[in-house]
A protein has these predicted regions:
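Structured interaction patches on ligand/partner-binding surfaces of diverse proteins
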Residues: 446-471, 564-567
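Short, acidic Ser/Thr/Gly-rich low-complexity loop/linker segments typical of extracellular
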Residues: 403-405, 411-435
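Beta-strand-rich domain onsets/edges
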Residues: 365, 371-391, 463-467, 472, ...
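C-terminal outer-membrane/trafficking sorting elements
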Residues: 480-489, 493-567
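A short, amphipathic beta-strand motif
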Residues: 392-400, 428, 468
């Protein structure tokens, strides 16, 4: 009897051990999901702000709500996450449904099905062919896998650049956030078809250069195939493109091809206003994303245009739509901090004005809901573009020749943290969005005396026109030494300045900072990457005027400029 009991016990133990060996541990299962799907979503408890700010440096946070942090992991980040030993729950992937592909181009143009990649390419080409006087197709670049990243320019004269304020709508830089992709195609179709029928559309198209990039991450959306089946957030190399832009806090991030192409495109076109469309929540998110303690100089203006987008959506979709956080609006860092985001790059580095608009609380919008998504948003889309018609629209020119002058436009006592704007190098035109009130603008340019225009009246929903005539210095002694070919900003500065590296300055460079008496204050070697601003720490410098010299180690070519430190 005892022997039988022993045998039964042994069998039970062996069975239990065998069952245990077949149970996949959570970490291993997480690895398997990432390996199979290219990504995984997990949740962790919200503990404190400092912990979340550390987390966002290393992984992609999707959202923070109800004391829960939603995190996306890729093949590049899953091992780091596991090593941190977070207490986490895997979010079970709901099988993607409703990704109905159009059977032909005509069906795709009903905007209630997803096009194949080849149909998308054909759609973009068809717009420019059907409306050559209003539309031009351009290529921003190619993805890692060679798919085209395309953009349409819709304007009264699409072949000429620089004659009108440029605005930019872009979507789906996260490949599994698909609703904005179709919404942007639908918007392009709507603008072109209604140019002659709608005075509102005609005003926008005649007075703006409207650029639309429906799909910023085609590899994430289509993978290596032709249809959308298992879209992922990341590009083909596993990078989150909305954490990949230059950021002083994450300087070593490997810039992806899609990011470098987009940076070049945005620098070229000098967009005054832009919006970046996402999914996952329903909210308009405005700068800053990376600083909780800093407010953009135009914070109230940003809040007002974001509020207008959400409130307009409420009128046409009802109060249940776009009501996340502050009834559909948030300052980015209040929600959670993002490093390397496109919104802050556009606003800080390029002096533009960009918001991030989350249009669906589902990542993948089912095809059956694409029409509803359009109905919820198209009035807001037009209203947001109309913001570019307001504010101060100016022209900076030489007082004698009337040639355009590239100048810095600065508001003393107001502008900060790179909020100033610059007049266009080729046309001298600029746009400065401001809240209603009286404003004093100061213009400074190489070789010209500064000009201050006082009591410029900005009225809500109206354009204020301004012509600024600048007088050149009559001799070099009189000029304050703006011989630099470097763009330094912010200038004056407090903690750090940035320099846009000119052509010919790449690789290792010698950086020297010299004070006004000729004393060498700093001398070191830095690595310069073309297109990425050089960040110079000036915290240890006392107030004063300084010259900075960059000399290529290999080429021995030097570039220099002057900046002012104010403590």
């Amino acid at each position: 009897m005892a022997r039988h009991i022993l045998i039964i016990v042994l069998i039970s133990v062996l069975t239990a051990l065998n069952s245990f060996s077949q149970v996949v541990r959570p970490d291993e299962r997480l690895r398997q999901i990432v390996s199979q799907n290219g990504q995984a979503e997990v949740t962790i408890p919200y503990t404190d702000r400092q912990s979340i700010d550390l987390l966002t440096v290393n992984v992609s946070i999707l959202s923070v709500k109800n004391k829960i942090v939603y995190v996306s992991l890729s093949p590049l980040t899953v091992e780091w996450f596991i090593l941190q030993k977070y207490e986490y729950q895997i979010v079970e992937k709901i099988e993607t449904r409703g990704l109905v592909s159009a059977s032909n181009l005509s069906q795709a143009m009903n905007w209630d099905k997803y096009p194949t990649y080849f149909q998308y390419d054909s759609l973009m080409q068809s717009f420019s062919k059907l409306y050559p006087s209003l539309c031009r197709l351009d290529t921003i670049g190619t993805s890692v896998n060679g798919k085209l990243v395309l953009a349409l320019k819709i304007s009264g004269n699409p072949l000429i650049d620089g004659d009108k304020p440029a605005v930019f709508y872009t979507s789906t830089m996260h490949g599994d956030e698909t609703g904005g992709f179709i919404m942007m195609l639908h918007l392009a179709d709507y603008l072109l078809k209604n140019y002659s029928a709608s005075s509102r559309v005609k005003t926008l198209v005649d007075n703006l250069a409207i650029w639309i990039n429906p799909l910023a991450n085609p590899d994430g959306t289509y993978g290596t195939g032709n249809t959308i089946s298992s879209p992922t957030r990341y590009n083909a190399n596993g990078y989150d493109l909305n954490r990949n832009f230059p950021d002083p806090f994450t300087p070593n991030t490997v810039k992806q091809k899609e990011t470098l192409d987009m940076m070049k495109f945005m620098r070229k076109h000098n967009f005054v206003l832009s919006a970046n469309f996402h999914s996952g929540e329903e909210v308009v998110n405005y700068p800053w994303d990376r600083w909780l303690s800093k407010f953009h100089a135009d914070d109230s203006w940003f809040n007002s245009i974001s509020r207008a987008y959400a409130d307009t959506a409420h009128v046409y979709a009802g109060p249940a739509y776009m009501n996340f956080l502050d009834n559909g609006v948030t300052r980015g860092a209040v929600w959670y901090i993002v490093y390397g985001g496109r919104q802050d790059f556009m606003t800080w580095e390029l002096h533009g004005r960009e918001v991030t608009i989350e249009i669906d609380d589902q990542y993948v919008t089912p095809a059956a809901q694409l029409t509803l998504l359009w109905q919820n948003n198209w009035h807001s889309l037009l209203g947001y573009l109309e913001n570019a018609l307001y504010g101060i629209h100016g022209l900076v020119r030489d007082v004698s020749t009337h040639n355009p002058v590239p100048a810095k436009v600065f508001i003393n006592g107001y502008d900060k943290d790179s909020s100033q704007v610059y007049s266009d190098t080729l046309t001298g035109s600029f746009v400065r969005f401001l809240s209603p009130g009286l404003w004093n603008l100061t213009f400074s340019a190489k070789g010209y005396r500064p000009v201050t225009m006082s009591n410029i009246n900005v009225t809500s929903r109206l354009e204020t026109d301004l012509i600024v005539d600048m007088s050149p210095y009559t001799n070099k002694v009189e000029a304050p030494g703006y011989e630099t070919s470097l763009l330094l900003y912010p200038n004056p500065a407090h903690d750090d300045i940035r320099a846009i590296p000119p052509d010919g300055l790449t690789g290792k460079v010698n950086v020297r900072i010299i004070n006004s008496t000729g004393m060498l204050m700093s001398d070191y070697i830095a690595e310069v990457v073309h297109g990425i601003p050089i960040i110079i720490d000036i915290k240890m410098l006392p107030s004063g005027t300084y010259t900075i010299v960059f000399t290529g180690i290999v080429t021995r070519t030097s570039f220099h400029g002057r900046f002012v430190v104010i403590k």
